[in-house]
Amino acid sequence: MKIGFDNDKYLKTQSARIRERISQFGGKLYLEFGGKLFDDFHASRVLPGFHPDSKITMLKELRDQAEIVIVINASDIEKNKVRGDLGITYDMDLLRLVDAFTNNGLMVGSVVLTRFAEQPSAIAYEKKLKALGLKVYRHYPIDGYPSNIPMIVSEEGFGKNDFIETTRPLVVITAPGPGSGKMATCLSQLYHENKRGVKAGYAKFETFPVWNIPLNHPVNLAYEAATADLDDVNMIDPFHLEAYGETCINYNRDVEVFPVLNAMFESISGSSPYKSPTDMGVNMVGLCISDDAACAEASKQEIIRRYYQAMCEKRKGNGTDAAIRKIELLMKKCNITASNRPAVMAANVKAESTGSPAAAMQMQDGTILTGKTSTLLGASSALLLNALKYLAGIDDSVELLSPLIIAPIMDMKQNHLGGDKESLLHLNEILIALSIASVSDENAAKAMEQLDNLRGLEAHSSVILAQIDESVFKKLGINLTCEPKYEGKKLYRK
C-alpha cells in the first residue's frame, strides 16, 4: 500500500485548529462530531496512512480541555434501532462508547435523551444510566423544528430542554449514529448559555466530504458511494462562493439547513459567526494529503468495494436499485469498472473453471492467489491458508492442515453439533485448528505469525459468504467483496 496521508501532521494541525476555534468564541465551544470517532476504516482506506483511531488520538491531545456528551434519540431506544456495522442496538452502543472514551482517558460528562416523550423504554434506560453513575438530561420534541424559528428559540422550544451542566471549554457532542439530535443539542445549549450570559460557540467536525479538494475528486466521490443509501450529494457551497469567491465542497444536507441555522444563530445571540456551512467546519484532512495520486487510487478501489456491497445488500433484501445506480454513475465519473479490482476476475475465472465457489486475494506485491472448494475446505478457507503460506515463504505443495486434523472436526460438527451434512469448516474453525497445529508443526507456527500481515489485502469471493466468514475477514483487516449470489438455493442462511 502506497502511503498518501501524513497522519502525524494531521494530529498536530487538527488539534491546533480546534484550539483556535475555542479561543474564537471566548473559551467555550460545542463541537458536533459527525462520522466515526473510533475505527474509521473508511477514512483509512481512502486516505492510506490515516490511522483508524486518529480522531480519538487527536482528542486525547485535548483531553484536559474536553468533555464528551453522548446523545441518543429516545425513539431509537423504543425501536431498538441497530447499528449496522456492529450489529448492536444504539442503547448498547452508547455504553460501549462511554467505556471506550473512559479507557482513552477522556471525560464523559453526561448523556442526553433527545426527542424524549415519556417512552417507557427510554424511561427504563434513563434509570439504568443513572444507576451506572451517569448524568442524564432530557431534550424534548419541538413543534415545527427546524423551520419555526420563533417557536424553537423560545421558552417553549429550546427553553423547555434541560440545560446540560458542563465544566470544560470544549464540549464534544457525539452519538451512536445519525439522526440522534447532535446539532439540535448544540443549539439548545447555545440558547441556554446565552441566557446565562455565556458567549459560547458551535462548530462541526466531519471528515467527509473534504472541503478543499475538487468536487469530483475520488476521495469525495468515495464518500458519496459510502452514503449512497442516504441520498447524500456533494456540492459546491454556494454561500461560501458568494461570501468569499472561493470554491469549497460541502454536502446537500448542510447546505440546505444553513439558512435555518444562520437564522437561529442570529435569534439566539444577535448575529451569526458564519457566512457559510464550510465556515462552521474545522476539518483539516485535506491539508494532510501527501500523495494525491495514492489517495485517488485508493478511493477508486473503495468505490468498487461499495458497489459490490450495495449489490450484495440488494441480494439480501436490504438494499435498493437506486443505491446501485448511484454508485455505477460514480464509477463512470472515475472511469473505472469492476475489472479494475484484480481479485474479482481471478475469483470468477477460478469458479468457472472448477464449477464450484472460488475466492482470490491480491497480495502487497501484486501477486494474485486463489482458493477453490474441495471436499474438506471451502474456497475462502483454502484462500486464507494459501495466503499465509505465501507470506511465510512455505511451498504451495505443503499442507498446513492435515486431513487427519480436519476430518474429525468435520465429523463432530456434522454428526454431533447439528451442522449441515454438506457444510464445511468456517474460517474461525480453520484458524483455531491451525493455532492448535502450530504447537507441534513448524509450518503452521510460521503461518500463524503472518496473520497481522493480511491486514489491508484485497479479496473477492464468487459467492456471498456466511456471516461468520465475512466477520473473520473483517477482523483480520482484509477488504472483502463478494459476487451478489449465494451458493445453493436454500432460504435459511447463518
Regions of interest found by a model, annotated:
Residues 177-178:
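The conserved Walker
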Residues 185:
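Hydrophobic positions on the alpha1 helix immediately C-terminal to the Walker A/P-loop
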Residues 372-373:
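Short clusters of small/polar residues that mark proteolytic maturation junctions
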